[in-house]
UniProtKB/Swiss-Prot annotation:
Coiled coil: none annotated. This is Probable endopeptidase p60. PANTHER family: MUREIN DD-ENDOPEPTIDASE MEPH-RELATED. The lineage of its organism: Bacteria, Bacillati, Bacillota, Bacilli, Bacillales. SUPFAM superfamilies: Cysteine proteinases, LysM domain. The gene is iap. One of its GO terms (molecular function) is cysteine-type peptidase activity. It comes from Listeria ivanovii. Belongs to the peptidase C40 family.
Length: 524
């Protein structure tokens, strides 16, 4: 009898073991079911897509029903970062196709919860709110341990003791509620809006500085002799007019030396004597930047020869005028305006101008030729063969098409330049704020060309061309990993005008944050 019981007990034990085994296996693996995604499984199991792919040697996000996936734990350590852009959009998902939840100001600290496959971060901010941001706009990584330390200080001093090495002063300043304020204010007091100069910090832009100091982008570029809106960390900028002026008397006093007089005889000074008082503010800085190196080393006169008078194009710099450029290249103001389709003498720093070429001449000749064949045709109706006038007619129509195409590109870029410095907003259609495709659609519409609303649709509807074929007025497209997500207007020389997070501005299509995402060009 006892033997029978032992046999039954052993059999029961085997049965229990047989049913228990799958339960243990399911603790570290999961079987994919219809409708499952890596992202959904990661959320359900408290891990990340990257961790799942690494654990299972997956090269893509594709999974199939019945597939077994190994589940691994994710390191619990999180990182704290700060926003480096002026404003950073927080979205409901990892990519620009998701809706904007809110926008965080530059310098705001966030906690990185996880990293997505496309370079986006899931973050937490404020009072436990979460969202997704583009990782390239976050910087200054620190371990996120300080957050719990602040709360522990309010409960027990014994627990807060380890923080004494890094924050002894904070502990002595009693209430823990002071800590967030102290951290927030450490960045703002650094900006003294009454100061006349400012040292550039990470995340700064000329547009943001102009807002802080109550001036314009153009003024800051002018006072600092900047040829583009690019600035670098540590650069000292004049943000008040007096800062630009204080440097000029020193340079003028020392230009009385015979060496300086040779430089003064250049066309630049002739231009300055003829310009209005408003432009005189720009000219002294140009002298300041040119002369200052001369005191340190004699090779300073190098800036003058940098203008290649044999070049066919010229990039506008601070203090330039059409008259000055025409004198430098031995041409006339009217010819430069005709070459570039300009209706006024207004120029923008960074604008690329044609200074040589045959477009105006070709237009003049084509018009005079158009008259000549007409006269000949009328006078020689019976004696001249009809083939000659028809040839002339075709030649003239082709010439007019070429000139109208050039004028169209020039007017399109001129329209784009009108909006430099305007703010970015997702879904912005203009004219006060834009997003990238809203900007291109608006500018092209002003030239009579209708574009689709999104960057992806604009890419699909354009004729694809290589970079060597690209001309000013063509579209340039970028892909951040989930398809076409950004578009700008190409202006030549590797530059584009586009609406991005920092507003409407010039950018180098091969520069940092752009070159690696460049897809190509399109013509409409």
């Amino acid at each position: 009898m006892n033997m029978k019981k032992a046999t039954i007990a052993a059999t029961a034990g085997i049965a229990v073991t047989a049913f228990a085994a799958p339960t243990i296996a399911s603790a570290s693996t999961v079987v994919v079911e219809a409708g499952d995604t890596l992202w959904g499984i990661a959320q359900d199991k408290g891990t990340t897509v990257d961790a799942l792919k690494k654990a299972n040697n997956l090269t893509s996000d594709k999974i199939v029903p019945g597939q077994k996936l190994q589940i691994t734990e994710v390191a619990s350590e999180k990182t704290e970062k700060s926003v480096t852009a002026t404003w950073l959009n927080v979205r409901s998902g990892a990519g620009v196709d998701n809706s904007i939840v809110t926008s965080l100001k530059g310098g705001t600290k966030v906690t990185v919860e996880s990293t997505e496959a496309n370079g986006w971060y899931k973050i937490s901010y404020g009072e436990g709110k979460t969202g997704y941001v583009n990782g390239k706009y976050l910087g200054t990584t620190v371990t996120s341990a300080p957050a719990p330390e602040v709360k522990e200080e309010t409960t027990t001093q014994a627990q807060a003791a380890p923080a004494a090495e890094t924050k002894p002063e904070v502990k002595q300043s009693t209430p823990a509620t002071v800590l967030p304020k102290a951290e927030t204010k450490t960045e703002t007091p650094a900006v003294d809006t009454t100061a006349s100069t400012y040292t550039v910090k990470s995340g700064d832009t000329i547009w943001a500085l102009s807002s802080k100091y109550g001036t314009s982008v153009q003024n800051i570029m002018s006072w600092n002799n900047l040829s583009s809106s690019s600035i670098y960390v540590g650069q000292v900028l004049a943000v008040k007019q007096e800062a630009a002026k204080t440097a000029s008397p020193k340079a003028e006093v020392k230009t009385e030396a015979p060496t300086a007089e040779k430089q003064v005889s250049a066309p630049v000074v002739k231009e300055n004597t003829q310009t209005t008082t408003a432009k005189k503010e720009v000219t002294p800085q140009k002298q300041t930047n040119t002369q200052a190196p001369a005191q340190a080393a004699k090779p300073a006169p190098a800036p003058a020869p940098t203008v290649n008078t044999n070049a066919s194009s010229y990039t506008v710099k601070s203090g330039d005028t059409l008259s000055k450029i025409a004198t430098t290249f031995g041409t006339t103001v009217s010819k430069i305006k005709a070459l570039n389709g300009l209706n006024s003498d207004n120029l923008q720093v960074g604008q690329v101008l044609k200074v040589k070429g045959t477009v105006p001449t070709a237009n003049t000749n084509s018009n005079s030729n158009a008259t000549a064949p007409t006269t000949n045709t009328n006078n020689n109706t019976s004696n001249t063969s009809t083939s000659t006038p028809s040839k002339n007619t075709n030649t003239n129509s082709n010439a007019s098409q070429g000139s109208s195409s050039t004028a169209s590109a020039s007017s399109l870029i001129a329209e784009a330049q009108k909006h430099l410095g305007k703010a970015y907003s997702w879904g912005g259609n203009g004219p006060t704020t834009f997003d990238c495709s809203g900007f291109t659609k608006y500018v092209f519409a002003k030239s009579g060309v209708t574009l689709p609303r999104t960057s992806g649709a604009q890419y699909a509807s354009s004729t694809k061309i290589s970079e060597s074929q690209a001309k000013p007025g063509d579209l340039v497209f970028f892909d951040y990993g989930n398809g076409i997500a950004h578009v700008g207007i190409y202006v030549g020389n590797g530059q584009m005008i586009n609406a991005q997070d920092n507003g409407v501005k010039y950018d180098n299509i091969h520069g940092s944050g752009w070159g690696q995402f460049l897809v190509g060009f399109g013509r409409v």
